[in-house]
Regions:
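Glycine/tyrosine- and acidic-biased, solvent-exposed loop/turn segments at the edges of beta-strands
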Residues: 1-310
Length: 310
């Protein structure tokens, strides 16, 4: 059965075990004055004040053990001034400032062990300037910059024990410029270039332990454009595909370790399986082993049996 909301005076609700659940006051049909909520064990869970139906003044939330969880200040229903929160062990967990309901000034979060987790600044609810994030062991996890609420400039990410993980650059909240990733043991993992949030230019995916590049691609407006190349650890080229506008694969070439061309196939369109034009295979001495001419993936002349399963 629903409780009838009074126009004036108190309203009280109870838990099933008989303990008080809520106590609120009304004036002219609106919440007004002190309100309190309780846990089933009789411990206060929340308390605060209303003014003309809106939360106003200090509001406090508690853990079941009686420890304060959060203290908020409100004005006309909006957060105003300093807001604090605590871990259940009593250690402060968060400190923020608000103006007219918007985050304003410095904000800090802490781990339960007292170590800072995040610290940054806001103006009118928008992050601005440097934001730092830390691991629970105290080492830095993230450093980034904001301008007018958007990511701008260099951003750095670290692994838990101090090794650099990522280095990114933003402009107007979009990736822009060189971006670099590392493995936890320090070896560079990937390197890419962006413009206005899209891959543009050279991207390297992996290096051998001796520093030799494993794979390299070129992009234009987020699509593979021109060469996609693989190398062996000794620096010789293994294979290379040539693209136009992303998936239009036009040519695929392989090389032997001695540098001699092993095979070269031509394609057309977006379909990976559509061979079109000349397909050639060589032996390690540069002598042609087989040649065929394809049109729309059908062999129209040459050594079909050699190429049919390729």
């Amino acid at each position: 059965m629903d409780l009838i909301q009074p126009k004036d005076g108190p309203r009280t609700e109870y838990h099933k075990n008989g303990q008080k659940l809520t106590e609120e006051n009304y004036k002219d049909g609106k919440l007004n004055g002190k309100w309190t909520w309780w846990y089933e064990n009789g411990q206060i869970s929340n308390e605060g004040n209303y003014k003309d139906g809106k939360r106003d003044g200090k509001q406090t939330d508690y853990y079941k053990n009686g420890q304060i969880r959060e203290e908020r200040n409100l004005k006309d229903g909006n957060l105003e001034g300093k807001q604090n929160a605590w871990h259940e062990n009593g250690q402060i967990s968060e400190e923020r400032n608000f103006k007219d309901g918007n985050a304003e000034g410095k904000s800090t979060k802490w781990y339960a062990n007292g170590q800072i987790e995040i610290e940054g600044n806001c103006i009118n609810n928008r992050p601005i300037g440097k934001l730092n994030s830390f691991y629970e062991n105290g080492l830095k996890k993230l450093e980034m910059n904001f301008k007018d609420g958007k990511r701008d400039g260099k951003e750095t990410v670290w692994y838990e024990y101090g090794q650099i993980k990522e280095e990114r650059n933003h402009k107007n909240d979009k990736l822009d410029g060189k971006q670099t990733w590392w493995y936890e043991y320090g070896q560079k993992r990937r390197e890419a270039n962006y413009k206005d949030g899209k891959l543009n230019g050279r991207t390297i995916n992996g290096w051998y332990e001796n520093g030799q590049i494993k794979e390299e691609r070129n992009y234009k407006n987020n699509r593979i454009h021109t060469n996609w190349t693989w190398w062996r650890e000794n620096g010789t080229k293994h294979s290379e595909m040539y693209y136009i506008d992303g998936m239009k694969r036009l040519k695929w070439t392989w090389w032997y370790e001695n540098g001699q061309k092993e095979a070269e196939y031509h394609f057309k369109g977006f379909d990976y399986g559509t061979r079109d034009g000349r397909s050639t295979n060589w032996d390690e001495n540069g002598q042609i082993e087989a040649v065929a001419i394809f049109k729309d993936d059908e062999c129209i002349s040459g050594d079909y049996d050699y190429f049919k399963d390729l």
